Amino acid sequence: MSEYSNRSQAGADYEWHYEYYEDEEPVSFEGLRANRYSIVIGFWVGLAVFVIFMFFVLTLLTKTGAPHPEMCDASMKPHVLIGCELEVGGSLAFSLPPLPDQSRSLFHFYIHKEERVKTHKDAVIGRGMHCGRGNAERADEDEHFMSSFNIPNFVNSEQSSSLGHDDFLLSEPPIITDGQSDELKTAEPAHLCYDIIRH
């Protein structure tokens, strides 16, 4: 190692040094050898990193909402129940919160259009409309109606911002004791009904 020092002529308070390290031996890679399990270790580390990355990606997608492609086939469109109530033996098990004004007007349009399409006299519009499909003719009418009624497949954040996260939670189901469970088995089967029109 060689050393070079210099004192500044202007001020003798400090001095600086250069140290030069001479490489007597060149760097050799002969002693480097891969571990025999390095491929296995690399595979598992890569898999762990990929799983953690996908966990964060899916978490972000569930928070922001993934874009849904438009379905070409009308029969493939999902049927959504909005404002539905479940009645079990005359008691109300749960109900959803009332609809916002804009979505209420969409469902008024839905009801009026359905009134024009229907030919059955015994169908009831509004409260008490059964969610279950009665016969094949009703299913054909629903497919025809759903193909002509196009609901946009996105959520407008301005309308939904007035509702909090807790507004979408269902109330807790009732506690059923052993004596009541026998009564429910013998009672009428549960049916769903729409509760759409609220003023």
Curated annotation (Swiss-Prot):
Residues bearing carbohydrate: N6
Main location: membrane
One Pfam family linked to the record: MRAP
Disulfide linkage: none
Regions crossing the membrane: 39-59
Domain of life per record: Eukaryota
GO cellular component, one term: endoplasmic reticulum
GO biological process: energy homeostasis; energy reserve metabolic process; positive regulation of adenylate cyclase-activating G protein-coupled receptor signaling pathway; protein localization to plasma membrane; regulation of adenylate cyclase-activating G protein-coupled receptor signaling pathway; response to starvation
Subcellular location: Cell membrane; Endoplasmic reticulum membrane
The keyword DNA-binding is annotated on this UniProt entry: no
Tissue expression per record: Expressed in adult brain.
Coiled-coil boundaries: none
Topology of this chain in the membrane: Single-pass membrane protein
Note: Two paralogs of MRAP2 are present in zebrafish: mrap2a, which plays a role during larval development and mrap2b, which constitutes the ortholog of mammalian MRAP2.
Complex and partners: Interacts with mc4r.
Family the UniProt entry places it in: Belongs to the MRAP family.
Function: Activator of melanocortin receptor 4 (mc4r), a receptor involved in energy homeostasis. Plays a role after larval development in the control of energy homeostasis and body weight regulation by increasing ligand-sensitivity of mc4r and mc4r-mediated generation of cAMP once the zebrafish begins feeding, increasing the capacity for regulated feeding and growth.
Name the UniProt record assigns to this protein: Melanocortin-2 receptor accessory protein 2B
Organism this protein belongs to: Danio rerio
